[in-house]
Amino acid sequence: MRTASKKWLMSLAFVLPALALAQGGADFGKYEYYAKCASCHGESGKGDGKVAEYLTKPPADLTTYAKRNGGVFPTQLAWDVIDGRPVAIGPHGTREMPVWGQEFRRETVRPADRLDPKGPSPEWFVSRRIAALIDYLASIQVK
C-alpha cells in the first residue's frame, strides 16, 4: 500500500506541472526563463542580467532573436542551443551558457525513473520544458 501511494505521489508531482504547462506554455516558459536565464540575459531578455558584467562574452539580447533572423523566430536553432546536444559551438559562441537540456534531464531523471514505466518518459518532460521556454522567448520578440 505504501509503495502504491509513493508512486501515485511521484506521478502527481510530474502530472501537475505538465497540466499547467499544457494550459499555458508561455506562462510556464516565463517561469523557466526567470529560473534559468534571467540572471544572465536579464528579466527583459536584453542581455543585461545581474551577472552579465562578470561574463567573458556578453549574453545575447534574446528579444531580437527573430529580428536577427529576417523577422522569423528561429525555433529549431533556439531548441538546439537550449538543448545543447545537436548544436555546434559556432552559432552560440562559447559554451559559457549552460546546456539547459542536460540540466533539465538531470533534474527530471532522478524522480522520473521511479515512475510507472508505461507513463511519460523523462525526455517527454524535458522537451515540454524546452518548448515552453521557446514559446516564452518567441513572445518577447521586438518587431
Protein language model features and the residues they cover:
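Short cysteine/histidine-rich zinc-coordinating motifs and their immediately flanking basic loops
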Residues: K50-Y54
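Bacterial N-terminal signal peptides that target proteins for export
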Residues: M1-L12
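Short, non-ligating residues that shape and space the ligands of small metal-coordination modules
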Residues: K46-G47
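Extracytoplasmic electron-transfer domains, predominantly the class I c-type cytochrome c fold
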Residues: L55-S121, L133-L137
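Stable alpha-helical elements in mature extracytoplasmic
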Residues: G25, Y33-K36, P74-L77, G93, ...
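Sequence context surrounding c-type heme c attachment/ligation sites in exported
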Residues: D27-A38, R105, P120-R128, V142-K143
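Electrostatic cytochrome c docking/interface patches
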Residues: L16-Y33, A60, T64-G71
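The canonical Cys-X-X-Cys-His
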Residues: G29, Y33-E43, M97, L133, ...
